[in-house]
Regions:
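Transmembrane-helix motifs of polytopic, lipid-linked glycan transferases
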Residues: 123-148, 313-326
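Short helix- or helix-capping micro-motifs
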Residues: 54, 157-163, 204, 208
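Extracytosolic helix-loop segments that constitute the early lumenal/periplasmic catalytic or substrate-binding loops
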Residues: 71-98, 102, 109-116, 261-270
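Membrane-interface alpha helices of multi-pass inner-membrane proteins
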Residues: 169, 185-191, 198-222, 252, ...
Length: 371
């Protein structure tokens, strides 16, 4: 049955898009303020107040909406199990857990916070994803300022991020953790663009240990590494240090869960099991598959493959057009972005273009808004 809130959600979505279109001209405007003066501008008051309102609104919704009960119940059970038996016996004790170790720690923390905070159990499990929403919004502000946007322009972008209905609903209403993974991937992209490879590698490792879907961006990361090495071969040293830090991160996170597992193969089996446990075109509702009645349709059938193939082809055509325009204008960053996009599309298709995860649109939205 349709949710009774769908008319309001539709109206809010349309209003948000209309507002974004209205503000687009202002966001594209180049003012006459010198670059040095722009850098000295502080975050405007309206942006700070807006961010506080976004946080307060999330808390109200989080405590009022129960969330997706299937996942909420899993989070509650897994968090309490971790508190009861510890990481060494966690996976052996729980009947089912398709999450890697990193986020299991957060579930355990949430289980402990439930005993002291005057919030509903679901609301407590929403706190960290909601915090990541807001941190991602602030990171968007920082990126915009580094791209020479004025403080007002960056503040508007930040609030568009903070009040995005899809992102808001996903964490505050639906109790999903996509914002955690999305923020980590934003940081990976941000530090990669800045050339800070000693930060890129461990953060990406942490992202993979939060949700295995981060592996799907490995192709894009590999392309970025290759291009960075082509531009400057000296970066291999910080990259090597970053790889070492990534391994240290993995050991710190995984080792407590491995004590009684008899080796590291259990983690590989866990990832393989998780990635193969949803062999369906989609298991959510925010896509065309659901509109055509194809929810839970097996990807073994050939018909569902037509849509991702078509979308991949359209994406390649669009990317090719962007590269052509960039070459004519001489803007090399666009060319590099286009090439990396092609590699990402082909890479994701190679890993299984039909694999759709819950609320994957949220990760895409945060990642592209942040970029």
């Amino acid at each position: 049955a349709a949710s009774p809130a769908w008319p309001w959600m539709t109206a809010v979505g349309i209003a948000y898009v209309a507002l974004g279109v209205y503000l687009l001209r202002f966001l594209q405007k180049k003012d006459a303020v010198p670059r040095d003066a722009k850098k000295r501008e502080a975050m405007p008051l309206f942006a700070i107040i807006g961010l506080i309102i976004a946080a307060a609104a999330r808390l109200i919704v989080a405590n009022s909406v129960s969330g997706y009960q299937v996942d909420v119940n899993c989070f509650l059970a897994w968090g309490n199990t971790l508190l009861s038996v510890g990481p060494a016996n966690f996976y052996q004790t729980t009947n089912f857990c398709d999450y890697p170790p990193a986020y299991v720690y957060i579930m355990g923390l949430n289980a402990a916070l439930m005993r002291v905070l005057p919030l509903s159990a679901a609301a407590v499990h929403k706190l960290i994803p909601m915090a990541c929403d807001l941190v991602a919004a602030v990171l968007t502000y920082r990126i915009a300022r580094k791209k020479n946007a004025s403080a007002n322009q960056a503040g508007i972008l930040m609030l568009l991020m903070a009040f995005n209905p899809a992102i808001f609903l996903n964490s505050a209403g639906w109790c999903q953790i996509d914002s955690v993974l999305s923020l980590l991937l934003m940081l990976v992209a941000y530090f990669a663009v800045c050339g800070n490879w000693m930060a890129v590698m461990p953060i990406y490792m942490l992202a993979v240990l939060v949700k295995p879907q981060a592996l799907m961006l490995g192709f894009l990361g590999l392309a970025a590494i290759v291009m960075a090495l082509i531009r400057d071969r000296k970066v291999w040293k910080p990259m090597l240090i970053g790889v070492g830090l990534a391994l240290v991160t993995a050991v710190i996170v995984v080792l407590p869960f491995s004590v009684n597992q008899g080796g590291i193969s259990w983690l590989i089996d866990k990832y393989a099991q998780t990635l193969s446990s949803y062999p369906y075109a989609t298991v959510n509702t925010a896509n065309f598959y659901y509109l055509f009645g194809c929810n839970w349709t097996s990807i073994v059938m050939e018909a569902p493959r037509a849509i991702p193939l078509l979308m991949m082809a359209l994406s390649l055509v669009w990317t090719g057009w962007l590269i052509y325009r960039a070459q004519k204008s001489g803007w090399q960053p666009d060319v590099l972005t286009g090439l990396m996009t092609i590699l990402l599309i082909i890479g994701c298709f190679g890993r299984g273009g039909c694999f759709a995860t819950q609320s994957g649109w949220t990760r895409t939205m945060i990642f592209h808004l942040g970029g």
